[in-house]
A protein has these predicted regions:
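N-terminal accessory interaction module
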Residues: 1-46
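Acidic-and-aromatic substrate-binding clefts and catalytic sites of carbohydrate-active enzymes
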Residues: 21-22, 94, 194-200
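Conserved acetyl-CoA-binding loop-helix of GNAT-fold acetyltransferases
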Residues: 166-180
Length: 208
């Protein structure tokens, strides 16, 4: 039987989007924790709660045209789109070029995690993912690894070097992907995952 869980940073997390209800009870989940040799399992209850909690998912469920953003954000998106080409790419592009990008970005993080070997990195790219490339002067400098499931898109892994922040690469990437998934494909929402506790990031601010 295919498992609904996967290992992630020493824990178990659900494979499906946060709006889907976990069917296993706590006894069954505890058994999976023991079998998987992890410390804990993480799952979501009461998704889209009106009350503020200490843990949240970052989602966007409304398409925004360029004119909907503030003047400052519009300018940053425009600059990003002028500086970078954002497009869907086959997995072979990331398999060939992604590891160097991953290594460079990882070293910029103040992270408690260890860098993956190339073999483990390539293994993490397997599955039913969509990949977006961020190209600067025709060179791949970043990417997003996305999973579509249950009418939602999870931006599961995004790697762009901080040296491109002043050229607004992430603004161009998020604007392009949000338009594609929310406007063109009409998905329920896109998500950048849970609130990050492993490294600092301002990417989530763009989605809220």
């Amino acid at each position: 039987m295919k498992s609904n869980w996967k290992k992630y940073n020493g824990s178990l997390i659900a494979k499906f989007p946060p709006h889907k209800i976990i069917k296993e009870n706590k006894i069954e989940i505890n058994q999976k924790i023991k079998e998987s040799d992890v410390l804990f399992a993480r799952w979501i209850t009461d998704f889209d709660s009106k009350s503020k909690t200490s843990f949240w998912y970052v989602i966007n469920d409304k398409h925004m045209e360029l004119s909907d953003y503030s003047s400052n954000t519009r300018n940053q998106i425009k600059k990003g789109l002028l500086n970078f080409s954002i497009k869907l790419v086959p997995s072979s592009v990331i398999l060939k070029n992604g590891y160097n990008i991953y290594q460079n970005v990882f070293r910029e993080y103040n992270s408690i995690l260890k860098i993956k070997s190339e073999a483990k990195y390539l293994e993490s790219l397997k599955g039913n993912y969509e990949f977006w490339g961020v190209f600067y002067k025709n060179k791949l400098v970043g990417y997003s690894q996305n999973k579509i499931k249950h009418n939602a898109c999870d931006y599961s892994t995004i790697k762009i070097s901080r040296k491109y922040n002043h050229k607004y690469a992430s603004y161009a990437l998020f604007f392009t992907m949000n338009s594609f998934y929310l406007k063109d494909k009409k998905l329920k929402y896109v998500s950048d995952g849970a609130r990050s506790i492993l490294h600092k990031s301002n990417i989530q601010d763009f989605l809220i």
